[in-house]
Amino acid sequence: MIKMISVKEAARQWNITERRVAELCRSGRIEGTVRQGRSWQIPADASKPADKRIRSGSYRKNQRSSCLPLPIGVSDFRLAQAEYYYVDKTMLIKDFIDERPMVTLFTRPRRFGKTLNMDMLRTFFEKTEQDTSVYFQDKKIWACGQKYRSYQGKYPVIFLTFKDVKFNTWEETFSAVRDIFAKETQRHEELRTSDRCDEYDERKYARLAEGNVTEVELSSALADLSAMLHKHYGIAPVIIIDEYDTPIQQGYMKGYYEEIILFMRNLFSGGFKDNRHLAFGFLTGILRVAKESIFSGMNNLSINSVLDHKYSAYFGFTSDEVREMAAYYGASDKYDEICEWYDGYRFGKTEIFNPWSVVNYFSNECEPRAFWVSTGSNDVIGEVLAEADEEIYHRLASLVNGETITTYIDTGVIYPQIKKNPSTIYSFLLVTGYLKAVKTTLSFNGDFMCEISLPNREIALVYHKEILQKFETMIPQSTAIAVQEAIFSGDNRKLKTQIQTLLMESVSSFDTAGENFYHGFMLGLCALLGGFFVTSNRESGEGRYDIQLKPVKKGLPGIIIELKAEKNGTEESLKQLSETALKQIQDKQYDTELRAAGVEVIYKYGVAFCGKRVEIAVG
């Protein structure tokens, strides 16, 4: 009978990684291998195949079937790096060791690799009976030298993930968190019989492991478990909490926000604040959650957000990583399409692609879709937009049409602030991945002033859906049809009547409205007109037009709209202002782009607003 060995044993014999051995098995380069479930059995006398990979380290064949599978939904580091295409993010470890903050909070949008990175940190730092260095010997961190290798496998680790704690009541949430702690406590079975822990510790361990604890006892579980591990190992543990804010967001939406905030504050205070049984800690989440509410008094907390350059390349894919992946899967010619759909995020100074969408794009035979926005949790944007007023909706409509807007950004924004101050919606949408910071300036008071825009086509689809739904509820279908007929026929009287009626019925106050407001209003209205590509603030002729409607099919007219606004104007001054707007279109030849595209009939509208009054000149 042929003696067989495991992938792990072959990796040790041949001095290569388990991932590499598994790849060789899948590609048929080791004779006699047998697949058993998710693993492989290899003849003990098999020889190590010659390494025919290209210098970059990626093994390529023309046939897609020979490529590594894509890690869709895989957050287990050992599995991801051994069995799937893995993008090496281990230099995160080096950057952390170089700085050594006591507690680090990483805030990034959902599905940007937070859980996989935290499991990577757990695997690297955790002291286990198994030699886990094999998972890093072909990674970038290992090439950095002994200084960094000395941290590998050195610490006990407490690892908790709250990513699935999404329940309707506080009681259900508490029960779920208690079960998570019980499983993690059971993972440290060595504490049950440790001769370095006293009877009091043993009783606490038993209660935690059995899930037989009160809310007060559970809120001190991090402090208690870290103290026991410190006693047993003689070295303080690393504490990692992944997606810490998921139950907090759920608490806000389901009505138990105060309960979860109080619990988390006590839990983190014991685990991270002045805990002498802590080596260092990591947290990840989407929102920072203000220090006053949870991290009160934690002066040892280092917060890393989407606006910070430090660690900016480790969550999501960089352009070089996407190019290499595209080449590996034989899709280098698709790079521009990937950029259009999934690039555009900017973390610090680094351009980042959405990793979830890129991986799904390759898995879907390079057919672009809105993968990220269909992963649930668009309740987030729905909840937020529900709090937006008309002006915010119109500014968001401007974003949909490719514009940028400038606003203050608070990366510590939380749900309750949005109801109190709707302008914080931009901060919320930025940190959750629905906007990107084009340019960031730190103001004198410590806040960020940012130019923001939509990151890519995938996200634009969400806004089109959500914002157009809002406008469709604001604007009756009969009005939209009447507006379209008036625009197509150049009937400025009919168009004026419809817009005037719409302003009177759908918007509450225009006392402080400026040109930007009316710009967004008209963009939203134009977005409802089928058969046109709507663009805004683009160069044409000798300047930039306000709004252009370019027909999708031949036979339809092209439309140029120039907007003006004034306060306290008379009927005559408003009429003159509309004529000034029309003259600007003509003088600056804003119709140049449409004529170059072969559009024969072009209507030009000068539209002037004052409060809820409008005047329109047509040419």
Annotate the PLM regions:
Residues 23, 27, 123, 428, ...:
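Alpha-helical DNA-recognition elements
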Residues 27-28, 432, 591:
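Alpha-helix C-caps/helix-loop-beta hinges
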